[in-house]
Every structure is written in structure tokens, then in C-alpha cells.
Amino acid sequence: MSEWLMLLLGTALVNNVVLVKFLGLCPFMGVSKKVDSAIGMGMATTFVLTLASALTWLIEHFLLVPFDFGYLRILSFILVIAATVQFVEMVIKKTAPDLYKVLGIYLPLITTNCAVLGVALLNAGEGAGFVRSVLYGFGSALGFTMVMVLFAGLRERLALTSVPAAFSGAPISFITAGLLSLAFMGFAGLTNH
């Protein structure tokens, strides 16, 4: 049990997909202007990333490896991720139309979010078991969501302050992201993962 907890902590805090592996930077910068939209995007990405980790593991171990179709890995993973995103988009459109409008173009862009594909490919490369792969995907998604919500909160606070003209907009956002990354380096000794 503690092994699974350490895996979740390791993927969320120590090996964060955004701050350490630099995956998912487009939604990290694009949807993080408001905390509400960051939470919605984070929840959608968490669902997609966790489900995609499970589905891509099943495809990897029951289709690609047994039939020696390794060369179709990226294509099949992208198709699975795209189908999962379409499912999530339909659910959000039906259940939360306001969130659907807020997320806008970024919801379909989860399909091309390199964090989702990157985690699926990292899982395939490690050769881990099913539960470990799903937990790795879930932990990565939790880390992605946590960092995006923290960053959105910081950006909301920065919008209320006076920032020098040379730093307003994207420059202060990148500086803030760098400082957030430095803060997460403090978790480096937490796990061995």
C-alpha cells in the first residue's frame, strides 16, 4: 500500500509532468488564467489521462506486443486518446455547458496534449503492470492538475498587482512558472521514483 502511495506522490510532486518533464505546457499556460477553468481542465485531463493509461496498457499488452505491432504504438495510442477525449467532451457538454464554454478550444486539444501521450508512452516503455500504469497516469494527472491550479491562483493574484510593463503578460507568467518549478524541486528527495 505504501508503495502505491509513494508512486502517487512521486509522480505528482517529484516527477511532475509539467515542471520536470515539460509535458502539457500548452494547456498549462493557456487555461491557467482563472482558477475555475484550471480546475475544470484539470479534472477533464485527470479523467482522460487515467482512462487513457488503462486503455493504452491493455492495447499494448493484448494487441501490440503479442502480434508484434509495436510500430503502431503511437498511432494506436493517439486514436485511443482521441476517442477518450471525444467521450469526455460529450459528457461535459451535456452535464456542464458553462464549463464546456470556458474550456473552449482547450478541451479538444487534450487529444494533442503531449502529457497524455507522453505518460502512455512512458508506461509502455517501463513495462509496468496494469495497476502501476494506471496509478502512474492518475498521479501524473493529479500533479498536472495541482500545478495548473496553483499557477492559475498565482496568475489571478498577479493580475491584481502592478507589474512593470516589460514583465506584463507572458514574461511574468514564465517567471512565475520557473519559481513554481523551483519550489517543486524541494520535493526531490521525497521518493526514489
From Swiss-Prot:
Described purpose of this protein according to its UniProt entry: Part of a membrane-bound complex that couples electron transfer with translocation of ions across the membrane.
Subcellular location: Cell inner membrane
Keyword set, alphabetical order: Cell inner membrane, Cell membrane, Electron transport, Membrane, Translocase, Transmembrane, Transmembrane helix, Transport
EC number per UniProt: 7.-.-.-
Family named by the database record: Belongs to the NqrDE/RnfAE family.
GO biological process: electron transport chain
Assembly: The complex is composed of six subunits: RnfA, RnfB, RnfC, RnfD, RnfE and RnfG.
Cellular component annotations (GO), alphabetically ordered: plasma membrane
Leading EC class: translocase
Transmembrane segments: 5-25, 39-59, 62-82, 102-122, 134-154, 170-190
Organism this protein belongs to: Azoarcus sp. (strain BH72)
InterPro entries (UniProt xref): Ion_transpt_RnfA/RsxA, NqrDE/RnfAE, NqrDE/RnfAE_oxidrdctase
Main location: membrane
Topology term for the membrane: Multi-pass membrane protein
Origin superkingdom: Bacteria
Annotated protein name in UniProt: Ion-translocating oxidoreductase complex subunit A
Pfam families to which the protein is assigned, alphabetical: Rnf-Nqr
